[in-house]
C-alpha cells in the first residue's frame, strides 16, 4: 500500500470571502433550473440487498461477548457526505458505508444501527456511545494515536468532464480552464494552489466556479458552463453514475488514502472481527457489488488491515 498517502476527509467550511488569486466566476449566484439539475439525492437511491450474505460462524465467534449478547453493532456517523453516508428520503441513514456496515453485521451475525453524530465528536465517543464509526474516516497517524482503524476503502481526488471531453481536459493540468466544485470544501484550496502553480509557470490562471452543492457544479459541467468538475473521488464517481451519461471521469485518482472503520483501542477482538468480516466481503465479491451500486467500485482494496501504516 505504498501508493496510499494520508489525506483528510473533505469538510464543509464557512463560505470564504475570497478564494485566492484564481479568477472567480459568478457561479454562486447563478440559477439552475430543477429540470436541468443533476441532483444525486433527487434520483432514486440505490437499493442494496445484503440479506443473502450469510453469517460466518468462525468470524462471529471473534465478536466480544458483550456485543454478541446484545446482538447489535452501534455506529456513529455524520450523515452529510453523500454517497458515503447521508439522510435518505425516509429520514433514515443511507449510503455505501451504511450498506457495508449492514453487510459486516450479516457476516458477524449482528444487527446494525447508525446514529447521527457530529463528525468531530464520533472518535471521542467510540467504545462508550458507539461500538464503531464508519463515516468516511481517512486513516492517519493522528487518529491512530487515539483509536484503531480497519481499512476497507480507498479515496482521493478525481475529475469529471462532459461526456466526450469536448474541452480536452488532461488532469492534473487545469491551467486556463473553468473549474467547478463545491464551495467550502478542501477543493477551495486545491483551486488556489493549482492557480498559483499555473501563473508561476507563466500559464493561464484557473477560472474558479464554486457552487453551493456538488449537484449544481456537476450540472454546470454537463451543460457546458464549466470545463471540469473536481472533488473527492467518491463524490465524483457518484455524480458520474447519476448523470444519465452526460458526465465521464478523466485522469487518475490523486492523493489516494485509505478509509477506516473506527474501533476503540481497548477492543482488539472487535477490530479483528471487523477486519475479518471486511476481508470476507472483499474475497466473496460482496464489497465490490455494494460499491458498484453506488458507482464507487474504483475504491476497492485487496486487503483489509487493522491500523495500516
Mark where each language-model region is:
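N-terminal export leaders
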Residues: 8-12
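C-terminal motif of bacterial Sec signal peptides marking the signal peptidase cleavage site
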Residues: 27-30
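Extended ligand-binding regions for polar small-molecule ligands
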Residues: 32, 37-57, 106, 165, ...
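Extracytoplasmic small-molecule ligand-binding "clamshell" domains
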Residues: 38-133
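Bilobed "Venus flytrap"/periplasmic-binding protein-like clamshell domains
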Residues: 93-106, 137-139, 156-213, 228, ...
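Acidic, polar ligand-binding/catalytic clefts
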Residues: 111-173
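A ligand-binding cleft/hinge motif common to bilobed small-molecule-binding domains
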Residues: 137-144, 192-193, 222-255
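Periplasmic-binding protein-like
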Residues: 153-161, 237, 241-279, 296-309
Amino acid at each position: 500500500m505504498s501508493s496510499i498517502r494520508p489525506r483528510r476527509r473533505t469538510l464543509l467550511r464557512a463560505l470564504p470571502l475570497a478564494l485566492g488569486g484564481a479568477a472567480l466566476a459568478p457561479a454562486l449566484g447563478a440559477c439552475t433550473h430543477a429540470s436541468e439539475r443533476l441532483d444525486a439525492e433527487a434520483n432514486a437511491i440505490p437499493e442494496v440487498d445484503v440479506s443473502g450474505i450469510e453469517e460466518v460462524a468462525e468470524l462471529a465467534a471473534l465478536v466480544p461477548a458483550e456485543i454478541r449478547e446484545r446482538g447489535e453493532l452501534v455506529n456513529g456517523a455524520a450523515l452529510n457526505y453523500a454517497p458515503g453516508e447521508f439522510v435518505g428520503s425516509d429520514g433514515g441513514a443511507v449510503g455505501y458505508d451504511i450498506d457495508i456496515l449492514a453487510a459486516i453485521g450479516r457476516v458477524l451475525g449482528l444487527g446494525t444501527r447508525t446514529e447521527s453524530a457530529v463528525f468531530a465528536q464520533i472518535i471521542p465517543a467510540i467504545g462508550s456511545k458507539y461500538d464503531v464509526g464508519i463515516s468516511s474516516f481517512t486513516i492517519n497517524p493522528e487518529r491512530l494515536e487515539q483509536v484503531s482503524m480497519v481499512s476497507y476503502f480507498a479515496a482521493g481526488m478525481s475529475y469529471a468532464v462532459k461526456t466526450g471531453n469536448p474541452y480536452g481536459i488532461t488532469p492534473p493540468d487545469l491551467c486556463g480552464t473553468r473549474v467547478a466544485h463545491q464551495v467550502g470544501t478542501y477543493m477551495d484550496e486545491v483551486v488556489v494552489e493549482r492557480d498559483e502553480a499555473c501563473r508561476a509557470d507563466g500559464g493561464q490562471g484557473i477560472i474558479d466556479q464554486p457552487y453551493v452543492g456538488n449537484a449544481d457544479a456537476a450540472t454546470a459541467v454537463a451543460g457546458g458552463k464549466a470545463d471540469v468538475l473536481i472533488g473527492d473521488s467518491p463524490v465524483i464517481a457518484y455524480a458520474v453514475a447519476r448523470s444519465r451519461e452526460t458526465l465521464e471521469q478523466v485522469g487518475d485518482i490523486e492523493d489516494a488514502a485509505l478509509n477506516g472503520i473506527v474501533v476503540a483501542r481497548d477492543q482488539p477482538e472487535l477490530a479483528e472481527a471487523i477486519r475479518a468480516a471486511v476481508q470476507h466481503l472483499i474475497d466473496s465479491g460482496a464489497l465490490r457489488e455494494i460499491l458498484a451500486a453506488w458507482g464507487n467500485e474504483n475504491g476497492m482494496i485487496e486487503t483489509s488491515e487493522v491500523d495500516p501504516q
